[in-house]
Amino acid sequence: MTEDWQSQKFRQNVISKIHDLLPPNAQDQTKNAGVMENHIFRKSRTKDEYLGLVAKLFMHYKDMSRKSQQQQQQQQQQGGPPPNAEMGGGQNMMQDPLNALQNLASQGNRNPQMMPMGAGGGAPVPGGPGTASNLLQSLNQQRPGQQQMQPMSNIRGQMPMGAGGAGAQQMMQVQQMQQGGNAPGVMNVMGAGGGQNQGQIVGNPGQQMGVGVGMPNQMVGPGPNSGPAVGGAGGPNAAPGAGGPGPNQMQGGPMNVNAMQQMPPMQQIQQNQLGMGMNPMMRMGQGNGMGGPQGMPGQGMQGMPQGPHNVVGGPAGQQQVGGAGLPPNAVQQGGMNPMGGMGVNMPPNLQQKPNMPMGQAGQMFPGNRGGVGVGGQQPGQPFMRSSPSPADAQQLQQQAQLQQMQQQQQQLVVGNQTPTQQPPTPQMPTPNMIPSPALVPQSSPQMMQMQNSQRNIRQQSPSASINTPGQVTGNSPFNPQEEALYREKYKQLTKYIEPLKRMLAKISNDGTNVEKMTKMSKLLEILCNPTQRVPLETLLKCEKALEKMDLISYSGQQFGKSSNPLLEVINTTLQSPVANHTLYRTFRPTLELLFGTDITAPVPAKRPRVEEKSTSFEQEVPHVLQGEIARLDTKFKVKLDTTSQINNKAIRLICCLDDKRLPSVPPVSVSVPEEYPWQAPDCSLAEQEYSATPFLQTVQQALIARISKLPKNYSLSHLLDTWEMAVRQACSPQSKPRAVCELSTLLGV
C-alpha cells in the first residue's frame, strides 16, 4: 500500500484538490494544477515527501489568501498604491504557481537554521510608502530534522516612489541577515521617479566599484576583515551630492577576488532582486546555494557562493531602474526575464531548474513604482523581506491583458524609443535598451566554476542568451517539456539541410517550378536559422513534407552525410549498374602489382573423347541403300524396324503404300541383306493381316505370283513397284486375274 501514491488515480485526486485550491481568476487552472502536481511527484521519493510538499502547497495558498486580505485593508487605510504596482502601468502581477511550487519543493532538501529577525523602520517617503508583507511564511514551518525557527515579524520596507519624474533622492531600507564571522557587505539601493539613486555595498572601504545601471551606483566589495560600516543619513548610505562619484566609476581599486574566496562558505550572501513588473515568485539561479545551517529557506536572502559575480544581480552585474517617466518595459539586469510582459529574456543560469532547491536562490518581488530594493547583509540590523500579495481577480485579469498589449508595443518600438519624462543617462542611450555585459567587470573562471559541495549543482554559462543592446526578445512560449521536444525535432531535421540545398540549386538551374522552389526556400530558412522559433506543429508539418520529397536523387547518396568528395564519388559509382566492372577494371592492376597474380590450380589434362558405340544399322547401312531410299516415290513411306536390328546383320525396313488413288493396305516388311545390291531383298507379308479379307488375300496372291516372276537380282525399288501393281491388280473389275508372265512383271503391268 506504500506505492499506491504513485498510481494515476491517487495523483488525479491530488490534482483535483490543487485545482480547487487555485484562485478562480487563474488562467488555465487544469494545466497549472497538473504541472504543479507533476513537479511535486518528480521531486518526491517517498509518499511522506509527496504528501508533505502537497501540504505545504495548500498552506502556501491559504497564507497568500489571508495576507492578500490584510494588504488590501492596509492599502485602504494608507491610501497608497499596491506594493506590487508595476512601473509605467501600475498593474498587479499574478504569482506564477510553478515558480511558487519550485520554491516549496526546495524545503525537502534544506535544513536551515533561522536567525532572529526584528523590525526595522524606514524613513518616510514622499508620495506614500509602499508596504511589503511576508510572502512565504508558510515555508518556515518546521519539518522533521530541522531546527526550530526564531520568531519573525513583518517588516515594512520603505519603497521610494518618485512623483512623476521628480529629482528627489530616496533610499530603500536595508535588507539584512545576521551571520557570524566576518561582516559581509550591505547593499542599499535607492530608486526615485526621475532622480538619481545610489546603492552601496559596504565592506572594505578601499575596494569600491561603480556599476552602471542607468544611475550612478556605488558598490564596495566585501572584505574578509571588514567591520560594519553603516552610517546615518550623512554616512555611506546618503545620496551623492554634486561632485559625487559618476556612473560606472571605479573607486579605489578592483574587487579583491582572493578576499572573497577566503570567506567561509557559511557566510554567503545573496541579494534579493526587486524587479519592476516581475513575477513575484520568480527565482534567480545565482549558482550553488548555501546548504548549511545558516541558510534561510523561503526568505528574501539565501546562501550564495562568494564570487565576483555576486554583485548586483548575477553575472551581468547590472540593474537598471527607471522612474515614472520610463517606459513600462523597465530593463532588468543581465538579461533577466521579468515574466510579466517585459520584453527581456532570462539566460539559462537565471532560469528555473527543476533539480535546484527552490529556497536556494533569491526571490524577486515587485516593489513600489520606481523603486528597486536589493538585499544585503549587515550585522546588528534586522532582516527585511519584501513580499507582495495578489489583488482581486478583476484587477489580475485586467493586468494580464494590459501587459500583453504593452509587451507587443515594446517589441515594436525597441531600439528607437525615447523617454518622455526623464532624459536618458550617458550609460543608457535609450531607456528600453539593455546594458551590454561588456560594461561590467567579468568574474574569474575559478569563481565561475566554484561549486558548493553540499548541493553539487552545476552553474550554467550565461553566454548562451545574454542580451546585448537592441536584442530584447519576448518570453518563450514553450514550457520545458515542449522546449526539449522542439530542440530534439529540430536536431533530427538538420540532416535535410544539404539535400534541400542541392534540390534548390538544381531547381534554380532548371528555371522551372518556381512555386516549389519558394516552398523549399522557406523550409531551408527554417532549418538553417535556429533562432527563428516556429510552432512545434509547423515543425512537424515540415518533417512530413521532407519525408515525402525525393531527396535521395538530389543528395547523391542514400546513406549518411559526408563532406568527403572521394566518398561521394565512390558512393555514386557503387549505385551504377556497372559498378562491379568499374571496380574490377580500376583496382585489379593495382592489386596485381601489390600482391601478384592469384595462384590457380593447374589446368586438368585433356582426356580423349569416348566415342559412343554406334548401332549396327549405322555401321551396316550402305550408302547405296540410303541413296535409293531417298530417291523413292513419295507414295512409298520407308522406315527402319528397330526391333529386329539387334543380332541380325540384315536391315529390316517397313514400307507403307500411301496413294490417294489406291485403297489402304497393310505395310510389308522388307529385309535388305548385307551384300545388297548383289543380293536381292526379301519381302514378307503379315499372314494375319493379309488373310483377313478376300481383297487382301487377292493382293497377297498377286504379289507372290509377281515376285516369283522377277529376275534373280532385283532392287528395293523394283520390289515396291511390284507390290503396288499387285494392289492395282486386286482392284481390277475382272473377277479372275490374268496369268502374270515375266514380261508383264518386268514392265510393271
UniProtKB/Swiss-Prot annotation:
The keyword Transcription regulation applies. Keywords: Activator, Nucleus, Transcription, Transcription regulation. Residues 229-246, 368-378 have a biased composition (Gly residues). Residues 63-95, 221-253, 351-479 are annotated as: Disordered. Residues 69-78, 393-420, 441-463 have a biased composition (Low complexity). One of its GO terms (cellular component) is nucleus. Belongs to the Mediator complex subunit 15 family. Component of the Mediator complex. This is Mediator of RNA polymerase II transcription subunit 15. It comes from Drosophila melanogaster (Fruit fly).
